[in-house]
Amino acid sequence: MEEYAREPCPWRIVDDCGGAFTMGTIGGGIFQAFKGFRNSPVGINHRLRGSLTAIKTRAPQLGGSFAVWGGLFSTIDCSMVQIRGKEDPWNSITSGALTGAILAARNGPVAMVGSAAMGGILLALIEGAGILLTRFASAQFPNGPQFTEDHSQLPSSQLPSSPFGDYRQYQ
């Protein structure tokens, strides 16, 4: 499948870690901008200053948390590819569950099970949506009739023509 044709694992981990940091920082910045604006005192200057302060203090922390999640997920995913010898959706689902469990380990076994279930379910939904999207997109472009490549199988009266017209039209 083309979906899984990506760069080798050491670079994939760094790439996913950086992408997750960027998503967390931008998404966290937008969320914190609204939160800081809403929780600031009345007055546009106070609200804008509160919004900017919330962005500066919380967005990098959220980006770092996302980067840890992305790096751990990619590390487990690459390990699963190496161990199993194939790259399929089960690796991502298992990686999501293990990442959720590992990141919740400090909160106890109940939290680990809950986070593992959420991580696995979330990644299963993402992988399922990707598979459905690929199937529906490929159904839009069905394979046409297969033409023979061997010109000896064509009737003798029919010569292969050029896509730009036949040379005989100019004689």
UniProtKB/Swiss-Prot annotation:
Region spans: Disordered: 144-171
Chain intervals with Low complexity compositional bias: 153-163
Post-translational modification: Degraded by YMEL1 downstream of the integrated stress response (ISR).
Main localization (coarse): mitochondrion
Gene Ontology terms for molecular function: protein transmembrane transporter activity
Superkingdom of origin organism: Eukaryota
Any one biological process term the GO annotation gives: protein import into mitochondrial matrix
Transmembrane segments: 17-37, 63-77, 113-133
Subcellular location: Mitochondrion inner membrane
Any one of the GO CC terms: TIM23 mitochondrial import inner membrane translocase complex
Pfam families named among the record's database cross-references: Tim17 (PF02466)
Keywords for the protein's UniProt record, in alphabetical order: Disulfide bond, Membrane, Mitochondrion, Mitochondrion inner membrane, Protein transport, Translocation, Transmembrane, Transmembrane helix, Transport
Keyword Mitochondrion set for record: yes
Disulfide-linked positions: 9-78
UniProt membrane topology term: Multi-pass membrane protein
InterPro entries: Tim17
Family according to the record: Belongs to the Tim17/Tim22/Tim23 family.
Known function: Essential component of the TIM23 complex, a complex that mediates the translocation of transit peptide-containing proteins across the mitochondrial inner membrane.
Subunit structure and binding partners: Component of the TIM23 complex at least composed of TIMM23, TIMM17 (TIMM17A or TIMM17B) and TIMM50. The complex interacts with the TIMM44 component of the PAM complex and with DNAJC15.
Protein name: Mitochondrial import inner membrane translocase subunit Tim17-A
Species of provenance: Mus musculus (Mouse)
